[in-house]
Amino acid sequence: MPTNAGTSLSSYKHIVAIGTTVKSESLESAAYEIPRKRKMRSDSAAVSGNSVSTPKKLKSHLPSSVPNPGMSEKEVVEDSNEILRYPVNLAVSDCLGTKSKWSPRDEEQMRAVKEALHVSKAPSTILCREDEQIRIFEFVKGCIDQQKAGSLYICGCPGTGKSLSMEKVVQQVGDWSTQAGLPPVDTLSVNCTSLSKTTDIFSKILGEIKPGKNANTNSSPLQHLQNLFSQKQESSSSRMMLIIADEMDYLITKDRGVLYDLFMLTTLPFSRCILIGVANAIDLADRFLPKLKSLNCKPMVITFRAYSKDQILRILQERLRVLSYVAFQPKALELCARKVAAASGDMRKALCVCRSALEILEIETRGSTGPESQGPTPDDSVVRMDHMAAALSKTFKSPVVETIQSLPQHQQIIICAAAKAFRGSKKDATVGELNKLYLEICKSWMISPAGITEFTNMCTVLNDQGILKVGQARRDKLKRVSLRVDESDITFALQEIRFFRNCLL
């Protein structure tokens, strides 16, 4: 091989250039320790012909996709043949890309999936709430930079990530203040529902600012705080204080005066309080902002919207991605996300539904008897749509679902036919077209179909019940038919019956 010494030096420089931390000594030892192919005579001649009496050239442990820029294609091939490093790299990549086999009978796997879906499992990254976190962080950061008190009101329905986002922001504020060389911010988190008396919140704030100091008998904790923030403090005690009042709507139902007094603490001339109130009541700001505005303590408002179907699905997928096996059918997760988003957008409820579906599969697997239950786990032994539908039925029960479940079989077949017909861009069809699909389903399952007159009458009944919409036409077959209910409701209502589950595939 020509220019061995030059090539080895170039290869080593290339390794250093891309940030490899392997030292030359370790590379030399690696070159001697790695098993080598038997040398051919041509190789021996090439080595003996080299006048440079240096150790064997240093070999780059980079894959062939990152060769030495100074080497030709032929040299790369020869170099790769000299040291057997590729089988090792391929084995590692194969291991990294292989998914483990999922088995609902494996207690360790089942425990890991349940843990990943538990409400108390705080993810490292709060997905779909990045904008809200940035706004909260910038608000707190601005107050600290200006050494100025302020108030913020965070509202949103339960399960929309408010408390979780606040925990993340508190961590970010601590990291930022440390990096900026600023004094740490004192943080007080209070769940208002845990207070024996609503006025106890002032005692907690006072205890955080002045540890061990109780208000004297002549003044209440609130009065003590008002006096404290009305006069200039010593520089040693001028640290900012972040107060997070969770479940703040509890104060509204108990004592609105406490709510007003709490926000007014941020308006005092020497106040160092950064107040963040968190509540489920979205209309709280609308009901009490006028009063707070008149008191010159109107807070900034950030609303956490309910999670959409796509957001719920993304969060569920992210939680399950840490597992080395697939435990849920993708369509089952989509069904959960769609139903929860339509009902409430509560992420905690979506997690509970998924855990419930997993438990249904677990019970089903344990309940199976016979010799076949001792064999290998079937490939479809994941959480399917029927498991998810059963779990959803425990949580949600809409009148539409109950109506569909109570219908006669042939009317349910018509609904399934309509759901299949309108899955794409097509939103309606004629009675005749729908009847053709109905007949195909009946024929495939060897069910005696109803005649066209009876079929038309059943469509009229479904129209009266608000499930189908049947238009007007001179001939019954030409009447336009469309669905009035969501396909997810149909799937949800009928998935527990195997016949309909297969019809909806």
From Swiss-Prot:
Subcellular location: Nucleus
Pfam families: AAA_22 (PF13401), Cdc6-ORC-like_ATPase_lid (PF22606), Cdc6_C (PF09079)
Keywords, sorted A to Z: Cell cycle, Cell division, DNA replication, Nucleus
Main location: nucleus
A GO cellular component entry from the record: nucleus
Entries under CDD domains matching the protein: AAA (cd00009), Cdc6_C (cd08768)
Region of interest called Disordered, as start-end residue ranges on this chain: 37-72
Official protein name in the record: Cell division control protein 6 homolog B
Gene that encodes it: CDC6B
Record's function text: May be involved in the initiation of DNA replication.
Superkingdom, natural source: Eukaryota
Organism: Arabidopsis thaliana (Mouse-ear cress)
Bias type Polar residues, positions: 45-54
